[in-house]
Amino acid sequence: YIESHLRPQWGWRSIFGIIGFILIYILIAIDLEIDFSQLLKDSYLYMKDVIGRMLPPDFTNFKNLMLSMLETVEIAMMGTLLAILLSIPVGLFSARNIAPNYPVYLVAKTITVFFRAIPEFIMAMILVIAIGFGAMPGIIALGLHTMGFLAKFYAEAIEHVSEDPIQALESMGASKWQVISFAVVPQIIPSFIGNNLYILDRNIRMATMLGIVGAGGIGYELQSAFRMFQYPRVSAIIIVIFITIFVIDMISSWIRSKVV
């Protein structure tokens, strides 16, 4: 009885849904003219050739690589700080249960959707044209784009808090900010820390790419190596990026396990 109860019940809707899902992807593959057999064959040959050119890695001027990687991490950290500072008020106002009124909620929600919709890569290109090369375009691009994500995460966390502490404080005549400070904030702190660490980890990965458009960091070194066909240098840069992100991911996981 237990096994039959736990066994998934496949109705006609589920079956037709799965068939429809498969057909959609078959049609997409046909429309994009994807030949999987040729793709696998060509990918193997091309990857074998590229990997052969990239070995052994060229770690000359290792100090410059590490300084560029440090700049990338600094850009990501400053971009994350900017995102946190901007997303706190936007996240509060885009939460249905504590927004002052619907127009304020709608404006805040629109802001989060707008900045999520513009990739940081495109935003960095626009900012490089507007204010020039360097770290600042990367910081602003990461801050604005990830502000949209953080504000969304904050709002969702706020909307799922327990209503009992909120109602208790409101019944005692507490102000809106007192309710937020003493009933909402304590409940969302674990989510707040976890989301911030996730965004920092993500921003470090994205900051490596923003240098390609002139926003500073190791991405510029990567672009230069590709442009000069210095594939051993490219593999060295990729290794440095991988080790850095791996170490930071381990640190983030440790912090998350201790705090969240």
Where are the predicted features?
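N-terminal, non-cleaved signal-anchor transmembrane helix
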Residues: 1-81, 88, 93
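Generic alpha-helical transmembrane segments of integral inner-membrane proteins
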Residues: 21-23, 77, 81, 85, ...
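Alpha-helical membrane-interface segments at transmembrane helix boundaries
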Residues: 66-74, 108-115, 201, 223
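Cytoplasmic-entry segments and transmembrane alpha-helices of multi-pass inner-membrane transporters
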Residues: 90-124, 153
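Generic hydrophobic transmembrane alpha-helix motif, especially the helices
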Residues: 113-146
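Glycine-rich helix-loop "coupling/hinge" segments at transmembrane-helix boundaries
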Residues: 129, 206-241, 260
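Membrane-cytosol interface at the C-terminal ends of specific transmembrane alpha-helices
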Residues: 133-199, 250
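C-terminal transmembrane helix and the adjacent membrane-cytosol boundary/short C-terminal tail
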Residues: 194, 235-260
